[in-house]
């Protein structure tokens, strides 16, 4: 299909995809104000954790809203890593497939240990939730803030409401330890309390800091491409791509960027076409490696037929008209007309 397309067609494709972005995939208008409110709240939380419990030496902001990857209509979502730097005392053991145990070289730290001084991730996660609950109650009393808290995987999810009590934005508050890779090594890793059934001592290695650094360095066009694919999969596929998450999409973009010559600086339509081709091939092969740990295949447990998803994308790419129609079917009538000219 690509060889048959001329410059005039690519210009049309770019116009249609840009219009789709404007209507379906733009950054939410209130995201910046949410970011400012979040930073104020986290400053209070850091003070609370650092000076009362010595459990926050460093804060790292991430998540789709912080990385400019949220789309209009989505909940505004942030991740915040609350890092206790303990590499002088903690080291990793039994690392495999992105999970590990954290062991202390000192019995005098006040953490939930087993008999071998491994930190119990499940107990620590519950302990951390309790601390956030106490802080939240103080914020509602003294700062008149409106929060609700829920357990959310490794994180405590904080739902922040506006003045009318309506959900404004969500934050995953992630407790994290910085630990050495082994007792004799100075290499440092970040670990978060991943819930694994019947394996409460295991933690997940986190690469959120590296991911955020790469995401923030992506060009505006690359971020636009990610938002467009997110909107396409979310809004135009009747839920078929629910299991192919925004994390899969962002990882695909990292690989395309690593290859070079992406995104196409002159034509957004071509960038999106190349993006879809990469995702289709990954799904067809049933393989999308974790960008920072390539022993992990992110499609291993996707719980949906990757072949079906690949065939669906292939249908969009079969010819020029199908590609244009996929982006114009739900938007302004003028753009629909442009797509069929």
Swiss-Prot record:
GO molecular function: 2',3'-cyclic GMP-AMP synthase activity; ATP binding; double-stranded DNA binding; GTP binding; metal ion binding; RNA binding
Top-level EC class as recorded in UniProt: transferase
Binding, GTP: 172
Residue sites binding Mg(2+) per the record: 77, 79, 172
Residues engaged in binding Mn(2+): 258
Pfam family, one: Mab-21
Biological process annotations from GO: innate immune response
Cofactor: Mg(2+); Mn(2+)
EC number: 2.7.7.86
UniProt keyword terms in alphabetical order: ATP-binding, GTP-binding, Immunity, Innate immunity, Magnesium, Manganese, Metal-binding, Nucleotide-binding, Nucleotidyltransferase, RNA-binding, Transferase
Keyword Signal among record annotations: no
Reaction catalysis annotation: GTP + ATP = 2',3'-cGAMP + 2 diphosphate; GTP + ATP = pppGp(2'-5')A + diphosphate; pppGp(2'-5')A = 2',3'-cGAMP + diphosphate
Residues involved in ATP binding: 64, 77-79, 230, 246-250
General function of this protein: Nucleotidyltransferase that catalyzes the formation of cyclic GMP-AMP (2',3'-cGAMP) from ATP and GTP and plays a key role in innate immunity. Acts as a key sensor of double-stranded RNA (dsRNA), the presence of dsRNA in the cytoplasm being a danger signal that triggers the immune responses. Directly binds dsRNA, activating the nucleotidyltransferase activity, leading to synthesis of 2',3'-cGAMP, a second messenger that binds to and activates Sting, thereby triggering the immune response via activation of the NF-kappa-B transcription factor.
Family affiliation: Belongs to the mab-21 family.
Protein name in the entry: Cyclic GMP-AMP synthase-like receptor
Lineage: Eukaryota, Metazoa, Cnidaria, Hydrozoa, Hydroidolina
